[in-house]
Amino acid sequence: MNKLNGRYVFGVVALAVAAILIVTGLAVAEPPVKIVQPPNEAEFNGGFSPKVLSKTKPTPVVFSISGKFRRIDGSHPPALKEFLLEGDKHAGISVKGIPICSQRELESRTTEQARKICGPALIGTGKTEVGIKFPEQEPEIPVNSELLAFNGGFKGGLTTLFIHAYITVPTPAAIVTTVKVKKIHKGRYGLLSIASIPKIAGGSGSVKSFSLKLNKGIISATCPDGHLDARGTAVFAEGTKMSGGVVRPCTGKG
């Protein structure tokens, strides 16, 4: 094979692989939405795969979500108190048949211990960065942790998830965020998730970024009109809020 033919074949293969990635939803280069609300700035992002979904029958998907928070001037950001996610009315959540883990089982546990104790209830993973800054201290201390999402059960129309993180500064501590998910009727949105973040380091810790991916089948969706929408709202301890929406294309079939 000469060089020209070799380049041609390589180019065709590369295009074919790219097309497969796009069609199957494995490409994750979707742009985030950026919100600037002085003195704060935030980015929200999210997506799902596969992108080809039934128009009428819920299709299991892998769901991902992420966020970043900062002060425009680079100083210590405010502490995140809640994160609300309004999901598309064509999406739903189900934890049926998955073992349950309680908040009590996760408290005071390291990441390894949480995974060992509640492994069968693990439904997602991710990572987070926290900045800790005490009034008398300079500079801010960056702390990174894995995120583990566990099934907390379904009762009375509410699905509960527990998201576990473990920090070692200033003292070792487990941070367990409770997420409550319920159905709503709000135009395009039909699912509301409210994540309540506990105080970190006595209120001196702030979430700077997070990313989380839920296992395939926790979220299912249909694609009747070519897109799925979501809207995130960050609520900070200082009383401010920041909101932004994303629209992700999908291909309906059947």
Please give the residue ranges for each predicted region.
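Initiator methionine at the very start of the polypeptide chain
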Residues: 1-2, 29
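Bacterial N-terminal signal peptides that target proteins for export
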Residues: 2-14
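Intrinsically disordered, low-complexity repeat segments enriched in small/polar residues
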Residues: 5-8, 23, 27
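Bacterial N-terminal signal peptides
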Residues: 12-23
